[in-house]
Amino acid sequence: MSLLAGFRVVQMGHGLAAAVCGRLLADVGADVVCIDPDTATPLAAYLNDGKPVVSRDALATADLIICEGRPAELRAQQRDADALRALNDAAALVFISPFGQSGPKANDPASDLTLMYSSGIARLLTGQVDDLSEAPIRPVGEQSAFIGGLAAACAGMFAAQPHMSGAIVDVSIEEALATMAMGELTSAGQHGRSRSRKRLTDGNGATVCILPARDGYTAISPREDRQWASWLVAMGSPDWGNDPRFATKPDRVANWDALHTLMSAWSRPHDKQWIADTAQAARVPSFPLRELAEQLESPQLVHRGFWRAVGPDERTAKAPGPPFGLSVARQGGVAEQPRGPLPLSGVRVLDFSWVIAGPTTTRYLAAMGADVIKVEAPGRGDPGRDSGLHTVLGQGKRGIVLDLKQPAAVGLARSLAERCDVLVENFATGVMDRLGLGAAELQQRNPGLIYVSASGLGRTGPESHAVAYGTLLQCYAGFAGLNRHPDVPPRVGFAWLDPMCGLMLAFIVAAALWQRRRQGGVARVDFSMIEAMLWTLAEPLLETQRGAAPVPQGDRSDRHRLHGAFRCAGDDEWIALAVG
């Protein structure tokens, strides 16, 4: 049983973001058809694979209509809201454009490069730098289209809830990209300024860093004191481990450059995979920096059936499939007619998630009207409280402190789950089951509970028990290694994957609620963050299999006559230009 079985979608036009939106909807079972799709590039062909081409007659019966284009273009093509409403007055309409359908920039041209600069993402992507003459860069793989398409799919599913007839959504890709940097936006809003790109002090890598290896690099994150103690033992308890400069996390931040030099001297003689395996054995999050080609034969991804065959004979190439395991059962769900002013009015969410990805998901759900109850541990709480993140991600949520090591607290958690519609958790694999809060037990108690698990590599497969953070998975997937200038070593960079996964998970929850409300099916979701990262890297993965594996190239592009960033007056002022 598909999540969106019977949900009819019409995708209009050549835009890549619209194609991404349609791809995600199709991947969870929606009936997606196209009017005038683009198949001219391998990426466009992959995104539109399996979507029948139809005439405008299909608009009359659609539940959701997706259009990409600037307002003047849409009016000229009779694809604006007035024209579409004349054909279908009940469908949710989703418009995607670089800067939105209104405002002084609404009809301005844009490209992936210029959107990364105008949104502020380019200056954040690689983290702080030693030399401001190093230009900011865009990420690999047409990421503006993927973020814009994900935002459209998420907003579209909220707008298409059964009681939201005739809703209109206006997605600005620039705004969707800017929202990826919630912490930075919060800092700018509270203090009136953003962080400098210039690295002025130690400490930039004290929570996550890249170590040189004999055959490449390994990313590692011994950020907590207990992880640091385990990592010292894994390294053979070096004498410098007793240096008071490194005794606590604040000490390691203050003396990071000296510490990184010592760890690098230890790591250089070893293979990158051995370093990561040694760290993981000590329960310290770590992964080698991989090339994209290495992912194509990953035992973990093969085990989970992530790859799908694409091409005329379905054997031409491997392309990413949906980044989650999904089951939908009629084990007690009952079709319902929701009421209320917002898409998720009346929905209650039990939130066991923490840090960035899960709390981002539940923040979106709260904004759409859900009653979110956030569960935190006594004393420790969500690490997001240590930064400005909680100011944003904690909005609109209620909270409860439960010590889940105590049977009474577990009993209270079960009681809460019996009264909720959705549960979201991102603990390490096996934790919720050991607590007696696993999907099988809670869905037996509450047959209508939508249970969403998010983890680094998924809940099944040979690597399912690896401990992970989103920034490390950016390195493991091959993303971080490509996001740099050719002569610059790889950096971990900005936490890109976490907020992107939050957006995708919010979409999945909205789709699961549509299914339960309309057809009574109840979903169990097993979400893999690395699969989500690779899902957005479809273009470089396809290029790799054609013998044109991508290499770091900064802001350069082979598809444009002029494409790059140019320095202007000021310490760190740049302009991005893209000429076709």
Where would I find each of the regions flagged by the language model?
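Rossmann-fold NAD(P)-binding glycine/threonine-rich loop
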Residues: 79-123, 437-446, 450-481
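C-terminal structured domain segments across diverse proteins
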Residues: 361-364, 390-400, 406-420, 440, ...
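The feature captures the short pre-catalytic strand/loop hairpin that immediately precedes
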Residues: 119-138, 477-493
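Flexible glycine/proline-enriched surface loops and loop-helix/loop-strand junctions
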Residues: 133-142, 212-215, 487-497, 568-572
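Conserved core of the PLP fold type I
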Residues: 39, 379, 386-392, 406
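N-terminal glycine-rich dinucleotide-binding loop that anchors FAD/FMN and/or NAD(P) in oxidoreductases
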Residues: 43-56, 117, 389-404, 475
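Acyl-CoA thioester-binding alpha/beta core of soluble enzymes
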Residues: 1-41, 51-102, 147-381, 410-414, ...
